Amino acid sequence: MSNFYDIPGWLDQIQEEILEPDRPIIDPHHHLWHGPETEQDGSNPYRYLLEDLWNDTESGHNIKKTVFIDCGQEYYDHGPDEFRPVGETEFVVELAKQAQKNPDKAQISGIIGHVDMMLGDSSREVLEAHNEKGEGLFRGIRHSGGWDADESVRNAHSEPTEQIYLEDRFQRGLEQLSDLDMVFDTWHYHNQISDLTVLAKALPSLK
């Protein structure tokens, strides 16, 4: 493996003192993925699965639980497009079950998946499918809103429209999310905070 992909080696260059090592911590945002096999020997520098997660959570902090955040992994390759992200929830649940066999290690305690909120009212069926496959771990969705007119600025992977937070269909989708007592996670640029503020005022019960 080339040094370019030696991420653990890069991280190990600096060791910081662990503050309050006994304080229980929930890691609120991580991903899990197989990644492509890119090296001639079949090794995979992009892989990040349960053992890799534990390697990080056992760095000296007292990390008890974690929350998985959607990253487009293991989507179904069949069926209606809107339901394909449910495959990611199923994938993470299986890893969570593996983790439960090692109760002394950090446990995956929540899943934030993806549902296209532009489905509007129809998003409810997809949310319910995630919830069924989530076996008690599915907590909500991330639909990122990051957008900028400057082509040199990377827009969010979910390909949002310019003012997606203000779209009627998007807000109707979030109403379904709120009605199911699920949470909404997003990311956006600073110049979109005003749109998010309008959204929050329009849906005050949304978590």
Where are these regions (language model features)?
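Helix-coil boundary/capping segments in enzymes
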Residues: 1-207
